[in-house]
């Protein structure tokens, strides 16, 4: 989302701590929009990493970037370790963030979040247009105890029309090892449901990847390794989380246990991948 994003830097430091190099990709400085972002950027990044002596390629993404990671891994067989955190199993309509008519986010008609060879990828259109899109987020967020809630955008859009096969992510094409991570109390979208659908898709289709679906009852949208978040907030992590997510306030110990379990699993996966 931003080459100087604080959490992205903490993610890079966490990967360094686990013995791997890290390269962050973003559409531009302070650009948190997702409009036809070219997959070629990831293709170029892979080529650059290989030309600079990296013999293995992995990808890690959270939130919208989690979706990006799964799509990229399904396109590029050089990627042999994929961490998709709170990732959807479908491509979304493109959206922009900023300030437009008092709205902080709005969908872009006719645009996808991702593109390939100059063409937008097939995507799920949001049922709400600007400005109703942001108004729905505000309505759901009000009084929820979460800093933001947007599940209605996805639930209502899925109810409005069935997904086409073209907009679903072909996770069966992913190589190596795949980790799908999310929580059922994610206030942004139904991360747990999407992971279960990907699990079912992989069971029904031939695939070569070794995949690990991890759905936690409690974890919020921040299903990140505990030690990564502690790099960002060395003091008062649980306290801050309570102000961001209601689930972190109601289930602080369970959410912390989730993050610690993710930390153990992903750190172990990186160690094993390095040694292969």
Where in the sequence are the language-model features?
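Acidic catalytic loop of the alpha/beta-hydrolase fold
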Residues: 185-189, 220-222
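Short alpha-helix in the alpha/beta-hydrolase fold that links the catalytic acid
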Residues: 8, 176, 190-204, 228-229
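Primarily recognizes the serine-hydrolase "nucleophile elbow" in alpha/beta-hydrolase
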Residues: 2-3, 44-135, 150-162, 173
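C-terminal catalytic histidine-bearing segment of alpha/beta-hydrolase fold enzymes
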Residues: 196, 204-276
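Alpha-helical scaffolding within the catalytic cores
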Residues: 6-12, 159-169
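Short amphipathic alpha-helix adjacent to the substrate-entry channel of hydrolases
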Residues: 5-24
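Short beta-to-alpha linker loops that shape the active-site pocket of alpha/beta-hydrolase fold enzymes
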Residues: 21, 26-31, 88, 219
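Short beta-strand/loop motif that positions the catalytic acidic residue
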Residues: 174, 180-182
């Amino acid at each position: 989302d931003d080459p100087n994003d604080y959490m992205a830097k903490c993610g890079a430091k966490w990967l360094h701590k686990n013995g791997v190099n890290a390269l962050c990709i973003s559409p531009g400085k302070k650009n948190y929009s997702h409009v036809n972002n070219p997959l070629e950027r990831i293709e170029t990044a892979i080529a650059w990493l290989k030309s600079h002596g990296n013999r293995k390629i992995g990808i890690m993404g959270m939130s919208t970037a989690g979706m990006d990671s799964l799509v990229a891994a399904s396109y590029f067989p050089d990627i042999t370790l994929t961490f998709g955190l709170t990732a959807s199993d479908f491509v979304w309509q493109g959206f922009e963030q900023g300030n437009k008519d008092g709205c902080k986010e709005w969908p872009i008609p006719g645009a996808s979040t991702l593109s390939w060879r100059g063409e937008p990828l097939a995507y799920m259109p949001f049922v709400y247009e600007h400005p109703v899109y942001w108004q729905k987020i505000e309505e759901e967020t009000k009084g929820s105890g979460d800093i933001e809630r947007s599940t209605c955008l996805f639930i209502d859009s899925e109810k409005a029309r069935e997904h086409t096969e073209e907009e679903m992510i072909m996770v069966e094409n992913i190589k190596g090892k795949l980790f799908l991570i999310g929580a059922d109390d994610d206030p942004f979208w139904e991360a747990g449901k999407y992971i279960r659908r990907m699990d079912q898709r992989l069971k029904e289709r031939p695939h070569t990847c070794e995949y690990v679906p991890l759905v936690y009852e409690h974890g919020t949208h921040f299903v990140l390794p505990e030690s990564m978040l502690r790099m960002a907030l060395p003091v008062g992590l649980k306290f801050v989380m309570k102000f961001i997510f209601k689930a972190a306030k109601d289930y602080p110990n369970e959410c912390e246990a989730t993050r610690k379990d993710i930390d153990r699993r992903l750190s172990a996966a990186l160690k094993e991948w390095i040694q292969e």
